[in-house]
UniProtKB/Swiss-Prot annotation:
GO molecular function: aspartate-prephenate aminotransferase activity; L-aspartate:2-oxoglutarate aminotransferase activity; pyridoxal phosphate binding
EC assignment: 2.6.1.1, 2.6.1.78
Protein name: Probable aspartate/prephenate aminotransferase
PANTHER family: ASPARTATE AMINOTRANSFERASE
Essential cofactor(s): pyridoxal 5'-phosphate
Reaction equations catalysed: L-aspartate + 2-oxoglutarate = oxaloacetate + L-glutamate; L-arogenate + oxaloacetate = prephenate + L-aspartate
Keyword Nucleus annotated: no
Site, Important for prephenate aminotransferase activity: residue positions: K12
Record has Transferase as a keyword: yes
Organism the protein comes from: Thermus aquaticus
Length: 383
């Protein structure tokens, strides 16, 4: 056997997927474990969305779809971006993908040449730098600091810009910090994209899960430089349906669709019709989002209050469903801390692959009883 490519051998598997798989395997073996690892809603997909999927099946809507998505969904996506985000886009400036992850993967394949630099704000979602490297680019990390609330410092970002800078990735609300970036910070970053002529990649997958503050889409300021990425997974509890969507300059969107045409062909057709229902039946969908958001807010408050009560520190998140917890009371580093907590019966994600050193990520996309049990075990692990 000749072996694998250097490109694939250099790529790291997703740390979050691996940790969650390990937790699930331990539970299958009967281990009493509270898993705070999953980056997905614990709610079921709303019934009106599932019914739309069943209807598509009954109507025989099971054939190939165009690489950029069915026209009806692209129109609904464009309308969503116009109505909710203030982005004046046409259906031709949108694409439907196999999850938001494929939108990002296709984008980097479409815009990066070998050696192009992409600024990534740390802590970051683990897949950003790997996708950049896979496309031949160079990820350039710019730290955000816990003492600054993990909010980006625009001047620190500015100092990282070079003639090779091709893009800057922003993710607000943020995974793994849960921080919602202030509008003035996003405005400053958009102005840099205009001034230095690079792409602004705005990952807004958690936009509907904000508990304090408001969401702002920087693409309103730099539409010709911004690719806005979103999807059905987090808002509508549709992680397994694998539908993402994005909007941006027509030439970039066309190139992303070309990548799809030579890889996945198109997203699942049935899932696209279900997502169309999620986007167009606003009354039912917004009621579901409001219910889920309130549940997450209560869980966040329960978790933060519990951590504070037992002397553990975390930057207060304003969105998403994650908390980054300081691990110094448990161990010298986040990996040892995660192992100690696993032995105590709680699975968490070490911050290493997020570039969140000295922290672990806790997901509160789980029931309140699980969170209470996890807090009890944290307290026991400190003794």
């Amino acid at each position: 056997m000749r072996g694998l490519s250097q490109r694939v051998k250099s790529m790291k598997p997703s740390a979050t997927v691996a940790v969650n798989a390990r937790a699930l395997e331990l539970r299958r073996k009967g281990v009493d474990l509270v898993a705070l690892t999953a980056g997905e809603p614990d709610f079921d997909t709303p019934e009106h969305v599932k019914e739309a999927g069943r209807r598509a099946l009954a109507q025989g809507k099971t054939k190939y779809a165009p690489p950029a998505g069915i026209p009806e969904l692209r129109e609904a996506v464009a309308e969503k971006f116009r109505r909710e985000n203030g982005l004046e886009v046409t259906p031709e400036e949108t694409i439907v993908t196999v999850g938001g992850k494929q939108a990002l993967f296709n984008l980097f394949q479409a815009i990066l040449d070998p050696g192009d630099e992409v600024i990534v704000l740390a802590p970051y979602w683990v897949s950003y730098p790997e996708m950049v490297r896979f496309a031949g680019g160079v990820p350039v990390e710019v730290p955000t600091l816990p003492e600054e609330g993990f909010v980006p410092d625009p001047e620190r970002v500015r100092r990282a810009i070079t003639p090779r800078t091709k893009a800057l990735v922003v993710n607000s609300p943020n995974n793994p910090t849960g921080v919602v970036y202030p509008e003035e910070v996003l405005r400053a970053l958009a102005e840099m994209a205009l001034q230095h002529d690079f792409y602004l990649v705005s990952d807004e997958i958690y936009e509907h899960l904000i508990y304090e503050g408001a969401h702002f889409s920087p693409g309103t300021l730099a539409p010709e430089h911004t690719i806005t990425v979103n999807g059905a997974a987090k808002a509508f509890a549709m992680t397994g349906w694998r539908i993402g969507y994005a909007c941006g300059p027509k030439a970039v969107i066309k190139a992303m669709a070309d990548v799809s045409s030579q890889s996945t062909t198109s997203p699942d057709t049935i899932a696209q019709w279900a997502t169309l229902e999620a986007l167009t039946n606003r009354e039912a969908s917004m009621a579901f989002i409001a219910m889920a958001r309130e549940a997450y807010r209560k869980r966040r408050d329960l978790l933060l209050e519990g951590l504070s009560r037992i002397g553990l520190e975390a930057v207060r998140p304003s969105g998403a469903f994650y908390v980054l917890m300081d691990t110094s009371p448990f161990a010298p580093n986040e990996v040892e801390a995660a192992e100690r907590l696993l032995m105590a019966g709680v699975a968490v994600v070490p911050g290493t692959e997020f570039a969140a050193f000295g922290h672990v990520r806790l997901s509160y996309a789980t029931g309140e009883e699980n969170l209470k049990k996890a807090l009890e075990r944290f307290a026991q692990a400190l003794q």
